[in-house]
């Protein structure tokens, strides 16, 4: 039998496919063996002596069906698992996923002014310290912290208002006490004693002069 390796290689080059896709008509092997140029191969392709095989179709319907079932949790029992738990899903990957979710939530809350930069830093360090196991716990902690801060602020405002009220009451009492002391025991304002006039000296009697003896 005549070798048709050259013709198959040229046909694959002309039809731009692999050599496995080339079909040579076995009844026309004598004519095909005479073709030793690309031009002759093109003529044989045009005549139908050389054909490009159709692409085989591999159905993925079963694969899609299995994927949907696995998404529901089917076919994932102990008998279907190969590899340790760490090999199937490393704890580091779980950690990175959780950190990214929680940090993304904190960044979103900070940008929307739901938390200030101080609470952001505090919660960020708690996330790093593995305090929150999921996003729901972090959100609950943020709401609880905000409510506690609002409560502390309300109590502080009430305390300051009470202090101001007590201070005003003390000032009023002090003013009334000063006023009572100024009025005196009789209830009326005590008269201010006028300064006594200066005493005038009494007139002295004239002493008679003695006559001198001459």
Curated annotation (Swiss-Prot):
It holds the Pfam family Ribosomal_L19e_C. The keyword Phosphoprotein does not apply. Residues 60-85, 144-214 are annotated as: Disordered. One of its GO terms (biological process) is translation. Keywords: Ribonucleoprotein, Ribosomal protein. One of its GO terms (molecular function) is mRNA binding. InterPro entries: 60S_ribosomal_eL19_sf (IPR035970), Ribosomal_eL19 (IPR039547), Ribosomal_eL19_CS (IPR023638), Ribosomal_eL19_dom (IPR000196), Ribosomal_eL19_dom1 (IPR015972), Ribosomal_eL19_euk (IPR033935). Residues 144-163 have a biased composition (Basic and acidic residues). Residues 60-83, 164-175 have a biased composition (Basic residues). GO terms for cellular component: cytosol; cytosolic large ribosomal subunit; cytosolic ribosome; extracellular region; nucleolus; plasmodesma. Residues 189-207 have a biased composition (Low complexity). Belongs to the eukaryotic ribosomal protein eL19 family. This is Large ribosomal subunit protein eL19x.
């Amino acid at each position: 039998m005549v070798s048709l390796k050259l013709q198959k290689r040229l046909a694959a080059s002309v039809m731009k496919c692999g050599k496995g896709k080339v079909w040579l008509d076995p009844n026309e092997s004598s004519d095909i063996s005479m073709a030793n140029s690309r031009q002759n191969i093109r003529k044989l392709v045009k005549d139908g002596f050389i054909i490009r095989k159709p692409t085989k179709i591999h159905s993925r319907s079963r694969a899609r069906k299995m994927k949907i079932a696995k998404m529901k949790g089917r076919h994932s029992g102990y008998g279907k698992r190969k590899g340790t738990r760490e090999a199937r899903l490393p704890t580091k990957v779980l950690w990175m996923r959780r950190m990214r979710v929680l940090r993304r939530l904190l960044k979103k809350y900070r940008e929307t002014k739901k938390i200030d930069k101080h609470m952001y830093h505090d919660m960020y360090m708690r996330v790093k310290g593995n305090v929150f196991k999921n996003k729901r716990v972090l959100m609950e902690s943020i709401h609880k912290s905000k409510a506690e801060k609002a409560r502390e602020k309300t109590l502080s405002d009430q305390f300051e208002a009470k202090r101001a009220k007590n201070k005003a009451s003390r000032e009023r009492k002090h003013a009334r006490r000063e006023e009572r002391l100024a009025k005196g025991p009789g209830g009326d304002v005590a008269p201010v004693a006028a300064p006594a006039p200066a005493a005038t000296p009494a007139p002295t009697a004239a002493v008679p002069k003695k006559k001198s003896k001459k």
